[in-house]
């Protein structure tokens, strides 16, 4: 059974609005009780969660289920290649302790393969509009992005 979980806590709510993290955790625990359930955690890596992937990994590790990281390709302005260099450095630093997990090195290599920071204006426009429509602020949950929103 694949459980699609992109973040924990309030960041989960932001990405999967109007998700409720305590409900997700409760449901996850119920799934874990199923007899012979082969559970995997699938995470779509994107601009909103790359800087907090370490938190998701730390939440997931005690469960000892496989964690798969899939990279969001569209819309391009949410792709991790759009991160400015200083945030790519920060993301890599936060993921460094988890290089032994499948695909973590691939995520880092992919992120550095190209510079799409020219798309940051589109990222900002989309995020500002999303925040207005939901009465939320990305920077409340990912303050590292405040300079770019």
What are these regions (language model features)?
Residues 1-70:
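Radical SAM/AdoMet-radical enzyme domain recognition
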Residues 10, 25, 29, 40, ...:
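Glutamate identity and glutamate-enriched acidic tracts
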Residues 15-17, 38, 51, 80, ...:
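Generic signature of intrinsically disordered, low-complexity segments enriched in small/polar residues
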Residues 28-35, 60-61, 87, 91-98, ...:
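Hydrophobic, Leu/Ile/Phe/Ala-enriched alpha-helical segments that form helix-helix packing faces
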Residues 47-51, 66-95, 104-120:
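Flexible glycine/acidic-rich beta-alpha junction loops that bind and position SAM and/or redox cofactors
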Residues 92, 96-149:
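Radical SAM enzyme core and accessory elements
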């Amino acid at each position: 059974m694949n459980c699609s979980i992109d973040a924990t806590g309030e960041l989960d709510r932001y990405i999967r609005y109007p998700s409720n993290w305590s409900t997700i955790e409760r449901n996850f625990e119920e799934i874990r009780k199923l007899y012979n359930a082969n559970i995997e955690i699938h995470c779509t890596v994107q601009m909103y969660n790359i800087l907090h992937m370490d938190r998701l990994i730390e939440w997931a590790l005690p469960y000892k289920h496989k964690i798969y990281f899939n990279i969001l390709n569209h819309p391009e302005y949410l792709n991790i290649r759009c991160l400015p260099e200083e945030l790519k450095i920060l993301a890599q630093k936060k993921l460094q302790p988890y290089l032994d997990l499948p695909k973590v090195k691939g995520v880092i290599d992919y992120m550095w393969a190209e510079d799409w920071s020219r798309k940051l204006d589109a990222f900002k426009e989309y995020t500002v509009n999303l925040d207005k429509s939901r009465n939320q602020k990305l920077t409340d949950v990912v303050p590292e992005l405040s300079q770019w929103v």
